[in-house]
């Protein structure tokens, strides 16, 4: 996944040269042999993203937050009252995600910027 670090953010980005948060999650899971459904929702539409995350939760299995599996989807609140951001837990307390003005980066799940924004960890239930 080192090759993904620093790739720019693009709304609707599905790779290989740019990603949005869901496009990156899809790429990481693909590398682990799991296909995720594609959602074509603008990153500017936080309420619609939140609604889609809620609607799709029955398809996902919630994991233990103390020791989440690798990979697992990290669902977060990001500047909103809706869950509107995703990343992928990659082990050792780290997750990879894509953000506007930052691009693809790896952060710690227990970092001050993220630990209170994580709603949960999930793996595909299909």
Which role fits each region the language model picked out?
Residues 12, 36-41:
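Surface-exposed patches in mature extracellular/periplasmic domains of secreted proteins
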Residues 113-114:
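Short, hinge-like loop/turn segments at secondary-structure boundaries
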Residues 2-7, 11-13:
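A glycine-biased structural micro-motif
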Residues 13-32:
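Active-site nucleophilic cysteine motif
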Residues 1-3, 125-126:
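Short, low-complexity, intrinsically disordered N-terminal peptides in bacterial proteins
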Residues 39-103, 109-110, 124-126:
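...with weaker cross-activation on analogous glycine-rich loops/strands in unrelated enzymes
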